[in-house]
């Protein structure tokens, strides 16, 4: 099985030196997807919400704040990974959020890459009021992030923006385009 896993990971272009490496790789790609989607917004889009009179639907700015704060809380409280930085940027612009989240999530990724002992991933720790393994918690974190990223992509469409492919083709592009966040726009 180890040989097969090694061959598969080599074929895909990345190496997973541990049983839970697939979770590290998934977090790595998810953070890039978030950064790609955020970079497609404009600063004037930040107050936009799905329906102007319904405050239950978070604005783009509130979504960015939530992502930064909730991911920081998950990693600090549940996974024991603190990057030693405030979760929100001083400059709450699109660029500020992309830079802050990009920096902090890369630090988290580096720590996750260092967790090569299966026991760390399998240890049960507090997930709110229940005990769960760290692997389970990271899966929940990734799913939560993906859910909000989908909402943000829907808001880009409501704003009549082009939605570039952040990981493979989408209906908007019709072909494979890897979108690189443009911080200078």
Model-based region annotation:
Residues 19-24, 94-98, 139-142:
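Active-site rim elements
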Residues 77, 81-115:
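Helix-adjacent hinge/juxtasegments
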Residues 1-17:
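N-terminal amphipathic/basic-hydrophobic helices that include classical n-h-c signal peptides
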Residues 113-128:
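Acidic catalytic patch
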Residues 27, 31, 38, 101, ...:
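Hydrophobic alpha-helical core bundles mediating ligand binding, dimerization, or RNAP-core interactions
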Residues 42, 113-116, 156:
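A structural signal for long alpha-helical coiled-coils and helix-turn connectors
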């Amino acid at each position: 099985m180890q040989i097969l896993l090694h061959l598969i990971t080599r074929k895909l272009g990345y190496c997973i030196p541990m049983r839970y490496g697939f979770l590290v790789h998934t977090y790595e790609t998810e953070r890039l997807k978030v950064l790609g989607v955020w970079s497609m917004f404009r600063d004037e889009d930040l107050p936009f919400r799905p329906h102007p009179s319904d405050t239950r639907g978070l604005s783009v700015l509130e979504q960015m704040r939530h992502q930064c704060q909730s991911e920081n809380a998950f990693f600090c409280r549940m996974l024991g990974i603190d990057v030693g930085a405030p979760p929100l940027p001083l400059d709450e612009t699109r660029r500020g959020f992309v830079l802050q989240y990009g920096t902090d999530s890369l630090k988290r990724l580096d720590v996750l890459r260092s967790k090569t002992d299966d026991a760390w991933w399998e240890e049960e720790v507090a997930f709110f009021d229940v005990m769960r393994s760290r692997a389970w918690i990271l899966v929940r974190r990734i799913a939560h992030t993906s859910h909000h990223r989908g909402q943000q992509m829907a808001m880009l469409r409501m704003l009549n923006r082009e939605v570039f492919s952040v990981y493979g083709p989408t209906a908007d592009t019709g072909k494979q385009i890897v979108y690189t966040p443009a911080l200078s726009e």
